[in-house]
Design a protein with these regions (language model features):
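Acidic, serine/proline-rich low-complexity intrinsically disordered regions
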Residues: 1-389, 407-408, 566-573, 668-669
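Cysteine-centered metal-binding/redox modules
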Residues: 24, 28-31, 44, 48-49, ...
Length: 711
């Protein structure tokens, strides 16, 4: 037996023994009927569920899983068999970690060291968009204890600057914290835990991606391994000495298609492309990205702070704040304006008023960007404008919330001390606009107005009239008023059988792609993810069925889906990928539909959580009665139009109801003459079971009670 396979089998046997003992101890302590589950997931023990189809619900379900684990450890002198033993280690790690949640207060809640443990389903779904757009180009797993903490911190910071999502296991967590690495889900540097078994929590992220986005069926191990290898851009870095358990865990990663880079010399035990040494930490990042085939588009900007999507979630507390621009205290606005070519001076950057080094804490800020180009259209102004929020947030030490004339920007003391000034904000806008919108923008000029009088004049005389004009245009834009819709296949890198059809009244289910966005995407990249669908061959106006849409869907999904309707949830509903903001599902007792947002973790009157509802669709599957969609679609006049429209909505979580309430009430008033329609819609503060829901609807005389049966 080779040294490598000997280490793998030794580690898998050790984990198998620990797992069996831990299961027996737990059953002796709590009993076989004691419930066990990871928090906020519809996929039970995800590794076991995906590989075998077994739904672990109680401790009594685990001994059989231990038996499966042992069967994978054959001790044969064969690398493929040894990799299976690595999968056995993954199963064992999942069981050991799962047992930590058998306690009333799980081990991660009690831990004195940082580590989030299990990653809930909603977080994975929220990562769908940044993964498919490339904002998160890859996933790194960093584990162990480096001989030099500064070295591993540099590696993690490098990943962070490149947008790579990094999960950490072991002493590297403290080493990075001591070196000043900023951590947290929002910063995409995530400490999982100290035990090596905690690595399973990133493994289950990859596995649930296959179930959520890829429609891989539970029990299809071959399909699972194919999906993770081809579609999940993950890799592993180990630091410091490695024992047989770490080697065995690495074998499990390799079986999933994730290459492992270690910082010790493995000599002849290396497996080219799968297990390689890199003893020079300065080369670790380059080697890892090359092995996984991840290409990073470098953004070298003339600014003194790091710039990456990983900083988009950074929170700047008041105590850490140097200056602030906030509409509650001063005039603020952001506007992109199209001009003629001779009216724009390319790369002209103007700061009109005091810069942030004048000593004040708060300032006015009117951001005006003039753009010109032969292919530029006024409709693209708002598309570019909405990107300002992301670009400012990409700067380390900057926090931006809101848009238009209602926003808040904070700059940290640390960023200020590094030299960040308003000129750098202007540089970011110029470089990002001319890079990302180069197909339509030939010249770009940026003005940042901090003079309060001039900023107010710009807001009143230029910005507000432009906002109002756009709003009037959007309000008049309906599916009937345009001659084409657009496909969006951004999510196909994760969900190959899914394709969105984006219309003026139905944005992409992720909530991030409007009809104007799709139109701009097509203009920027005619061969890209959004393609026009000429609105021809209407077969059924009620359901929104078109021959051209069906042809486009069949082509975009490579025949996986042949027909969709745009306005029905019961007849060939549009498919979903998995990163939808909300899901609507039938509630038979009331003859209506519930709408649930992914942030809601509680029970619904349908008897299912969001995750359980979402498992009914996703991955390009059409399930009549269930449909993923964006938040803004809820108040659309086209929302489940074929089934009667929004008057079928009977329940939604309070946070969602409050968010869409104003728009939803306006639509209900226009369509049905109903005032305050949301008062007729129940939420979790009123009921979470179907009997109480029906009683509430009867009390409110909800219009759904008089509609035709759905089935």
């Amino acid at each position: 037996m080779s040294v490598l396979t000997d280490l793998i089998y030794g580690g898998s046997h050790a984990v198998a023994g620990l797992t069996e003992g831990a299961v027996n101890d737990a059953i002796a302590k709590y009993g076989a009927d004691h419930p066990i589950a990871f928090p906020d997931t519809a996929y039970f023990f995800p590794t076991i569920y995906a590989a075998t189809g077994v739904k672990v619900k109680t401790l009594g379900d685990l001994p059989a899983c231990v038996g499966v684990l042992k069967s994978l450890i054959t001790d044969r002198e064969d690398l493929g068999q040894a990799l299976n033993a690595g999968l056995a280690t993954a199963v064992g790690a999942e069981i050991i970690e799962g047992l930590k949640f058998a306690e009333p207060k799980d081990a991660y809640e009690q831990a004195t060291v940082p580590g989030i443990g299990f990653v809930p389903d909603p977080i994975i779904r929220s990562l769908g968009v940044p993964l498919v757009t490339g904002d998160i180009p890859g996933v790194a797993v960093v584990l162990g204890k480096a001989d030099n903490g500064e070295d591993v911190a540099k590696v993690v910071k490098d990943y962070q600057s490149k947008g790579i999502m990094t999960f950490m296991v072991g002493d590297v967590i403290e080493q990075c914290a001591d070196a000043g690495v900023k951590m947290g889900l929002e910063l995409r540097v995530i400490p999982l835990g100290h035990d090596v078994t905690a690595v399973i929590h990133v493994v289950t992220v990859a596995i649930r991606a296959a179930l959520i986005f890829g429609n891989v069926q539970p029990g299809d191990l071959a399909g699972l391994l194919k999906y993770t290898k081809e579609r999940v851009p993950a890799f592993v870095n180990t630091f410091g000495a490695i024992d047989n358990v770490v080697v065995s865990a690495g074998a499990g990663a390799i079986a999933l298609g994730f290459p492992v880079v270690v910082d010790i010399d493995l000599g002849e035990n290396q497996v080219p492309g799968a297990l390689e040494s890199c003893t020079d930490h300065a080369e670790t990042v380059k080697k890892s990205l090359e092995l996984r085939g991840i290409k990073i588009k470098s953004k070298e900007l003339p600014i003194p702070v790091a710039f990456a999507a990983a900083f988009e979630g950074e929170i700047i507390r008041k105590a850490d704040m140097k200056v602030e621009f906030w509409s509650a205290k001063n005039t603020t606005c952001e506007l992109v304006l199209m001009k003629n070519m001779d009216e724009v001076e390319d790369h002209k950057l103007v700061i009109d008023g005091p810069d942030i080094d004048s000593g004040d804490l708060e300032y006015a800020l009117a951001t005006c960007v003039y753009v010109a180009g032969k292919k530029m259209q006024a409709d693209f102004e708002s598309v570019i404008e909405r990107k300002i929020h992301a670009w400012f947030n990409y700067m380390e030490g900057v926090m931006h919330t809101g848009q238009r004339n209602q926003f808040r920007i904070r700059i940290s003391k640390d960023a200020y001390d590094k030299g960040l000034r308003l000129t750098h904000f202007a540089e970011v806008l110029y470089h990002m606009i001319t890079d990302e919108f180069d197909a339509v923008v030939d010249k770009c000029e940026v003005h940042l107005i901090t003079d309060p009088v001039k900023a107010t004049a710009f807001l009143n005389d230029v910005a507000m009239p432009r906002y109002n004009m756009r709003d009037d245009r959007l309000a008049s834009m309906t599916d009937e008023s345009v001659d084409r819709f657009f496909t969006c296949i951004l999510c196909q890198s994760f969900a190959p059988a899914h394709c969105c059809v984006v219309t003026p009244e139905r944005l992409g289910l992720c909530g991030a792609v409007s009809w104007l966005d799709a139109k701009a995407t097509y203009e920027l990249n005619p061969n890209g993810p959004s393609q026009p669908i000429m609105k021809e061959g209407c077969l059924d106006e009620r359901t929104g069925r078109y021959t051209t849409v069906n042809d486009a869907i069949k082509d975009a999904t490579h025949g996986a889906v042949e027909e969709v309707t745009l306005y029905s949830i019961m007849e060939d509903p549009m498919t979903s990928c998995g990163c939808f903001e909300c899901i609507s599902g039938i509630e038979p007792m009331s003859n209506g539909f519930i709408v649930v947002n992914r942030e809601y973790a509680g029970m619904t009157p349908a008897g299912m959580t969001f995750g359980e509802l979402a498992s009914c669709t996703g991955g390009g599957v059409q399930t009549p009665g269930y449909m993923g969609h964006g938040r803004h679609f809820i108040s659309s006049k086209k929302f489940i139009h074929a089934e009667g429209g929004i008057e079928r909505i009977v329940w939604m979580p309070k946070e969602l109801k409050d968010d869409v309430g104003e728009r939803l009430n306006k639509t209900a008033k226009e369509l049905y003459g109903i005032d305050n329609f949301t008062d007729m819609i129940a939420d979790e503060t009123i009921c979470t079971d179907c009997d109480a829901l029906l009683e509430f609807l009867q009390e409110k005389n909800h219009p759904v009670l008089s509609l035709e049966p759905l089935m």
